[in-house]
Amino acid sequence: VFESLYNVLKSMRNEGYEIELPKSTNELREIVLGGNSGKYGQEANVIERIDGSEIVENEPYLKEIEEVWGSAPGKIQSDGTGVFILGKKLGNVVVGIQPTFGYEGDPMRLLFEKGFAPTHAFSTFYRWMRNSFKVDAFLHFGMHGALEFMPGKKVGTSSKCWPDRLIGNVPNIYLYAANNPSEASLAKRRTNAVIISHLTPPLAKAGLYKGLIELKETVIQYRELADDDSNKKKLEDLIIDQAKLVNFKDFDTIENLWLKILESEDALIPDGLHIIGADLSEEKLKEYDGYLRESHNHQEVNKLLEKLKKQTEVKGITDALNGQFIRPVPGGDLIRSPDIVPTGRNIHAFDPFRMPSLFAMKEGEQQAELLLSKHETYPNSVAMVLWGSDNIKSDGLSIAQAMALMGAVPKFDDYGRLCGAELISLSDLGRPRIDVLMTLSGIFRDLLPLQVRMLASAAYKASLAEEPLDMNFIRANTLKHQKDMNIDIKSAALRVFSNAEGAYGSNVSHLIDTSSWDDEEELADTFNNRKGFAYGLDGKCTKQSELLSSALKKVDFAYQNLESVELGVTTIDHYFDTLGGISRAVKKANGGDTIPVYIGDQTRGDAAVRTLSEQINLETRTRSLNPKWFEPLLQHGHEGVRQIEAQITNTLGWSATTGQVDPDLYDQLSETFVLDEEMRRKLSELNPKASLRVANRLLEAHERDYWQPDQDTLDALRKGADELEDKVEGVGLAAE
């Protein structure tokens, strides 16, 4: 982040902006995150302290904020009598640090909160920027800020909506990853953002390392022997022992193991972090060249590589600051949508009237059958998570998959516009209609209202279809809901669930991040409370927590598609927040039975369906434990260690929500990042606080009984954690 920020500030200064630029990236990081932070007990430098009396006098929405957070100045980013503005003034530019949502100090509010407002600190931050510093423009630097997720209408925001209240009429320029058009669209709709796209980290083949290399060599020897060779049994025993050492357990035959080794070796992984304003090296361009030729022709790849050589992202930012027109471009990931380059442009999404496309319907049908073949019998009900991002980038592939499972297709009017759903006859379908319990991200709900109504229509029509109940699981379950709950069939047929209007996420990830939960049922309750709103034929929502709980009892397995090559299920917390959250909710609803969880992968080449355990093992093998993944991250210093910590925290999130993480993975993560003295020292020097969190997450996994190391390992881990804690206390709060 700070390397990118430094490059942007340097370019702005060269264009005439009055900026007091430090001499280096490290100095910039220190004065922003360190500075006087120790003096005030804050996590970053304090620009200014705003007294509580000033907040009371100047906050126009004080009553609404106090109803949620109590009297000003509140407890967030506060000394009890005032609020701190964090960041650093650099001449005519302020590098500000957006305050947190505020739930971090009281995570149980995630379960019970009915309304919401930003904290005193959050509102004061934006008011200070507008009225005191008098900014001419905001540049939100990097996606996943909190502003666009504040309460209010999903589109056409007004003075009653918090995004409008906070940003006012100040232009909003937003630097955003090119592969996330869905959340970028949300920022456009709710904060009037002009998006400036940037590339995601370059990708590289994972390759093999340490024990994996030796294992592959042994398997090659085994495959070259004749079936009657006396050495074959000895090699087979050796292979099994070697495979255990590198956590290969899920294979039936040596040939199956061989395919899994090749899958690991060929997997694409992020190679470090993307830096705004830095040219791609020749080595990384060669990596791009290698895997792009798998799906694009020679001429296309050559043109693409020429575009990648050009630095356009900083210019996009400065052009926007100068009030120039920023050319639009569809968003997507580089492998599937090479037209996203050159970046530095204003990404947009799709044509909602034609989603899912015909191609997506064909692909979705094939993927649905592949998923069903993974399970031993036809499932009665499937819990499927649908995000906006992967559907926008794939023209609705996941939507098409849900429709295919239900035995339905989209209905289009004479103008080719989506207008509902139609059922496929059972004779054409050739199998039972699978009941699909769909939980949507808040972004899907906001950006794809036509598709929400289409999915609701498909479930409703299937519920009304006069068909044998053993061939129509949707109708069978609807009739049972109707009888057991004494509700009308229209309510009993509801299958599309999400947050209430204006709310986002299940908040399970917030509980995991703060470690402030006692047992897994709290996670299930939080998910149900947040996602218990059903969306019907008219697209409107009603609170249906009891119906959701009833539907969860019937679920045989949970499923979600991967969003992109770059973002695995252990890379970001969104996956366990949604898929993990509903899996835990199913377990509570059905009385404690753990259900299978599957991951669909259509990001590259032939589609695949893996169990969650297989997916986590693959990602841990190719990313977390792979020097080719973590060594480039460490070259980015502070931020790289934070990424490693996030990977381990997300792994813990899967243990908490599904219990489907191999305990041995924690052994290997401990050995790699904490028990190795040289690695521990390096992590601590680069980011003391994040390195301590790595050790504490591993200890938390033990304390929550997700992993039981031997006593020597546990003692060494505790000793390492104590050493890291001493380091943090020794360097003080200014360390970050």
What are these regions (language model features)?
Residues 1-736:
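Ligand/cofactor-recognition surfaces for anionic moieties
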